[in-house]
């Protein structure tokens, strides 16, 4: 069995409607199919940023190198791609490209051995506690509270809210503004988080996510304001996920800190070495697929750190290891995944449960591919 081709399928204008939205949002995904000469197909998805550049890297650089190689030798291929194409930091476009390829390789491996990827990787747990990233910035404060009640009424007990882009007047900060130009008064965000806490009570886990928007002094103010709300974690508060600044922040707040979602393996190692996080958020579509994701999970376990984050691919990593602690269900992404894929893991009563189908256990929805494929 040898690698023969890679096909990229771009989907666009997929309608998804989060709770309380009157009009659907339009989303898109970039799918990857890795094919072998004997008919096996591995499914994956391109994550991260600079998608056109990532697609070009896959088609023009990585595919010619991979053709004719054994798809079951994921460690050999990862090592060879690392040394041939990038021995410096392993980040950005290169990482998104090899991550998508590695996930597809593991899908093929699971199908070849007729075993789910999560079992091949370790099989520590079949179900993982889930949290819902529901708190979109488009919601008003009242809508945010109502949406929180919706998810709790539907059996979910862990909720995450986006923060850091709304100023004291309740106005959105200018798109693309740097962290230095955003409001440094947390009053509106605290009001929104308080509205959610009041709506769902103290028994529901509540998290905040700033998506790397803040300077250290700003993050300290936000943390001090959030501390009475008993947050499970504050995710990626510091600009650039700066390990040293995150470590300083941890010393100034009792709120646990999470980070790492779009980072490479080497950047995750920096976070661990700097004692910068309480939770390491590993994403297989950026860390280097399952091959490097398992190494990152092992590194986290060695330092007694749980791992979080997630999508339908990451769930296999979380289920494989004993420190797989929280699986993210991002509302927009999950609704998109339900439109694009069949046989997704089951979300019910605050848990994600994986199936026993070989490989990733998911299939493409051919109707969605037909309806939303980019010309």
Region locations from a protein language model:
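Metal- or metallocofactor-binding catalytic centers and their adjacent structured scaffolds
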Residues: 35-112
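Short Gly/Pro-enriched turn/cap motifs at secondary-structure boundaries
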Residues: 20-25, 153, 335, 358
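Glycine-rich, aromatic-flanked loop segments that form ligand/cofactor-binding clefts
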Residues: 98, 102-137
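C-terminal extensions of enzymes
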Residues: 340-375
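Conserved, mostly hydrophobic/aromatic
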Residues: 3, 39, 62, 101, ...
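Structured beta-strand/loop patches that form or line metal/cofactor-binding pockets in enzymes
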Residues: 1-43, 47, 338-341
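Metal-dependent enolase-superfamily TIM-barrel catalytic cores that perform enediolate-based chemistry
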Residues: 127-247, 252
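Shared catalytic-loop signature of beta/alpha-barrel
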Residues: 224, 230, 239-351
């Amino acid at each position: 069995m040898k690698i023969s081709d890679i096909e990229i399928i771009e989907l666009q204008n997929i309608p998804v409607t989060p709770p309380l939205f009157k009009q659907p949002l339009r989303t898109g995904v970039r799918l990857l199919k890795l094919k072998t000469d004997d008919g096996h197909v591995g499914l994956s998805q391109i994550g991260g940023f600079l998608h056109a550049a990532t697609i070009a890297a896959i088609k023009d650089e990585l595919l010619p190198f991979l053709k004719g190689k054994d798809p079951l030798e994921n460690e050999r291929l990862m090592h060879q791609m690392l040394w041939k194409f990038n021995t410096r930091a392993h980040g950005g476009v290169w990482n998104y490209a090899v991550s998508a390829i590695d996930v597809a390789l593991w899908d093929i491996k699971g199908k070849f051995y007729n075993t789910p990827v999560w079992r091949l990787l370790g099989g520590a747990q079949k179900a993982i506690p889930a949290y819902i990233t529901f708190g979109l910035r488009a919601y008003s404060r009242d809508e945010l509270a109502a949406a929180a009640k919706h998810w709790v009424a539907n059996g979910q007990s862990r909720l995450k809210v986006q923060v850091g882009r709304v100023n004291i007047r309740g106005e959105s900060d200018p798109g693309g503004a740097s962290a230095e130009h955003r409001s440094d008064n947390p009053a509106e965000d605290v009001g929104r988080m308080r509205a959610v806490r009041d709506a769902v009570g103290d028994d529901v886990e509540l998290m905040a996510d700033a998506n790397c928007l803040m300077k250290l002094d700003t993050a300290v103010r936000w943390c001090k304001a959030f501390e009475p709300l008993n947050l499970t974690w504050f995710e990626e508060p510091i600009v650039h996920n700066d390990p040293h600044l995150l470590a300083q922040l941890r010393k100034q707040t009792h709120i646990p800190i999470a980070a790492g979602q779009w980072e490479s393996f080497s950047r995750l190692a920096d976070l661990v070495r700097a004692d910068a996080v309480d939770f390491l958020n590993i994403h297989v579509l950026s860390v280097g697929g399952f091959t490097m994701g398992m190494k990152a999970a092992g590194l986290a376990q060695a330092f007694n750190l749980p791992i979080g984050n997630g999508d339908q691919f990451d769930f296999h990593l979380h289920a494989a290891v004993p420190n797989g602690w929280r699986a993210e269900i991002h509302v927009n992404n999950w609704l998109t995944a339900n439109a694009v894929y069949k046989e997704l893991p089951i979300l019910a009563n605050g848990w994600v449960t994986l199936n026993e189908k070989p490989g990733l256990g998911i299939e493409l929805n051919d109707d969605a591919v037909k309806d939303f494929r980019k010309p």
